[in-house]
Amino acid sequence: MNNGDSLTMAGIEIRAIPMYNLREEAKDLHVKGRGNGYIIERDGTRIYIAGDTEDIPEMRDLKNIDIAFIPMNLPYTMPVEAAADAVLEFKPKKVYPYHYKGKEGLSDVGKFKNIVETNSVNIEVVQLDWYPD
């Protein structure tokens, strides 16, 4: 699928959303148009899987997202603060931070949760142990 494409299979709609880097030093990692994030919708539930992206306008423009999966891992995606700011803009009901096992301090899931929950009582941050020791 290309950015902007959509398809429906077995009652599940899948829409490809751009994912890319904005920071100059990371633009070669994920070029706009090369990869996708996805919105998956079934029975009125909308799930957003961001892919390896930064806080891009296409993410900020999302509406009515029930569950979001947001990465935060420099240099490949975005810092904690940018991830939290994006989430506070498009306001999913529930957010799962992922792709956060990076350099010390650059992927602080607790800090992400604190920023989001301090600034919105309507967004639930769910922390899973994606990377057990």
Segments the model singles out, each with a brief description of its role:
Residues 15, 67-69, 96, 126:
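Hydrophobic/aromatic beta-strand patches that form the interior of the parallel beta-sheet core
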Residues 1-5, 84, 88, 93-133:
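Binuclear metal-ion centers of metallo-dependent hydrolases, dominated by the metallo-beta-lactamase
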Residues 39-90, 98-107:
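Metallo-beta-lactamase
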Residues 17-19, 33-37, 67-70, 87-91, ...:
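Short, low-complexity, polar/charged sequence segments that are solvent-exposed and flexible
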Residues 1-63, 129-133:
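Core dinuclear metal-dependent hydrolase active-site scaffold
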